[in-house]
């Protein structure tokens, strides 16, 4: 399972992201690459879980978009895995 995950995350980096991190349901980092901090894995998982509680009747998984002057972060949780993709903001 690890090789397909690493390949997928590397493809995300190749598409222009500056960092990517994948975490399990408990917030443990499964893999990271690029400019990310491993300690963010737990926060990413918690944010993704909380976002689902905003509208529990919704069938789709929410995507969280955090923006700053220097970084955009997209977070989404599917089944038992949370993913965050870091990119530079479009100007």
Curated annotation (Swiss-Prot):
<comment type="subunit">
    <text>Part of the Ragulator complex.</text>
</comment>
<dbReference type="Pfam" id="PF16672">
    <property type="entry name" value="LAMTOR5"/>
</dbReference>
<keyword id="KW-0963">Cytoplasm</keyword>
<dbReference type="GO" id="GO:0071230">
    <property type="term" value="P:cellular response to amino acid stimulus"/>
</dbReference>
<comment type="similarity">
    <text>Belongs to the LAMTOR5 family.</text>
</comment>
<dbReference type="GO" id="GO:0008361">
    <property type="term" value="P:regulation of cell size"/>
</dbReference>
<dbReference type="GO" id="GO:0005764">
    <property type="term" value="C:lysosome"/>
</dbReference>
<dbReference type="GO" id="GO:0071986">
    <property type="term" value="C:Ragulator complex"/>
</dbReference>
<comment type="function">
    <text>Regulator of the TOR pathway, a signaling cascade that promotes cell growth in response to growth factors, energy levels, and amino acids. As part of the Ragulator complex, may activate the TOR signaling cascade in response to amino acids.</text>
</comment>
<dbReference type="GO" id="GO:0043066">
    <property type="term" value="P:negative regulation of apoptotic process"/>
</dbReference>
<dbReference type="InterPro" id="IPR024135">
    <property type="entry name" value="LAMTOR5"/>
</dbReference>
<keyword id="KW-0458">Lysosome</keyword>
<dbReference type="GO" id="GO:0032008">
    <property type="term" value="P:positive regulation of TOR signaling"/>
</dbReference>
<dbReference type="GO" id="GO:0061462">
    <property type="term" value="P:protein localization to lysosome"/>
</dbReference>
<protein>
    <recommendedName>
        <fullName>Ragulator complex protein LAMTOR5 homolog</fullName>
    </recommendedName>
</protein>
């Amino acid at each position: 399972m690890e090789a397909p995950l690493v390949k997928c995350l590397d493809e995300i980096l190749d598409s222009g992201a500056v960092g990517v991190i994948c975490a399990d349901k408990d917030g443990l980092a499964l893999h990271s690459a690029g400019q990310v901090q491993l300690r963010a894995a737990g926060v990413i998982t918690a944010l993704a879980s909380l976002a689902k509680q905003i509208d529990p009747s919704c069938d789709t998984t929410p995507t969280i978009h955090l923006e700053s002057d220097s970084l955009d972060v997209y977070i989404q949780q599917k089944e038992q895995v949370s993913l965050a993709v870091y990119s530079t903001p479009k100007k």
